């Protein structure tokens, strides 16, 4: 079972928590869910070069707190904070709540599954060898502390007439072990031959305590620090309840 399902979804409530952290009644749930989808899509399209890993959305009373995990916070903030203020105003048009934007800097993008997948996809779009791209990314992740990495690419690889799937892995990736800290990311490479899908699994060790926020705490203590980028007055975020949308 662990080989088939999304490893993040499988571990929700054990050592992971959802990226949408709010509660809503049935009358508002659909609207808020579509707002979340639109916000994430807009951020990823506008900040393609910023190395966006994940976007966390919390909704305390009448507020929308957006936390962007990025490898290049300076690119998001812009000169004197101008770019992030423009982004905040654009996002505010998508929701009726007050929008605040925070940034978290990713100190080691080489072991972030989403960023690895994006990097491989960009290399494939530049006609790089898929084997070389996979091997280089895996070796870089292993060198910087990952205990295991698996990469799968699927499509018309190298312009072949028949689509196929290729896999490459190093180290251990125990997908059945629920206490394992496994990061998972996907990306698509748009080539002249069609779309090539990229999937990446990164194993970073075990989380022994039963705590849905364990991975977030571990990221903060292992080198990922919060970058200041609150574009409005600072307000308490403790009203957000952890829940999955």
Swiss-Prot record:
BP GO terms, sorted: translation
Keyword match Membrane: no
**Polar residues: which segments have biased composition?**
221-235
Residue stretches making up the KH type-2 domain: 39-107
GO CC annotation, single: cytosolic small ribosomal subunit
Which InterPro entries did the record assign? KH_dom, KH_dom-like_a/b, KH_dom_type_2, KH_sf_prok-type, Ribosomal_S3_C_sf, Ribosomal_uS3_bac-typ, Ribosomal_uS3_C, Ribosomal_uS3_CS
Pfam families noted in UniProt: KH_2, Ribosomal_S3_C
Q: Per UniProt, what is one GO molecular function of this protein?
A: mRNA binding
Listed NCBIfam families: rpsC_bact
- Please name the HAMAP family in this protein's record: Ribosomal_uS3_B
| Name this polypeptide is given | Small ribosomal subunit protein uS3
What organism does the UniProt record list as the source? Hyphomonas neptunium (strain ATCC 15444)
As recorded in Swiss-Prot or TrEMBL, the protein's gene is named rpsC
């Amino acid at each position: 079972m662990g080989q088939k399902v999304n490893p993040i979804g499988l571990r929700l409530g054990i050592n992971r928590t959802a990226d949408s952290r709010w509660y809503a009644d049935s009358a508002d749930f659909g609207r808020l869910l579509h707002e979340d989808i639109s916000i994430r899509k807009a951020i990823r399209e506008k900040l393609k070069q910023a190395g966006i890993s994940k976007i966390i959305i919390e909704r305390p009373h009448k507020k929308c707190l957006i936390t962007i995990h990025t490898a290049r916070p300076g690119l998001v903030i812009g000169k004197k904070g101008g770019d992030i203020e423009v982004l905040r105003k654009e996002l505010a048009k998508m929701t009726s709540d007050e929008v605040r934007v925070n940034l978290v800097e990713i100190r080691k993008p080489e072991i972030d599954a989403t960023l690895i997948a994006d990097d491989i996809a960009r290399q494939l779009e530049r006609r790089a060898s898929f084997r070389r791209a996979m091997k280089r990314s895996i070796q870089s992740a292993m060198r910087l502390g990952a205990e295991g990495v698996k990469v799968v690419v699927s499509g018309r690889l190298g312009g072949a007439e028949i689509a196929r799937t290729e896999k490459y892995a190093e180290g251990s990736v125990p997908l059945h072990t629920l206490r394992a800290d496994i990061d998972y990311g996907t990306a698509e490479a748009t080539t002249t031959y069609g779309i090539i899908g990229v999937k990446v699994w990164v194993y970073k060790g075990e989380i022994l305590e039963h705590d849905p926020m364990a991975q977030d705490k571990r990221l903060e203590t292992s080198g990922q620090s919060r970058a200041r980028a609150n574009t409005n007055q600072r307000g308490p975020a403790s009203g957000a309840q952890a829940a999955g949308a």
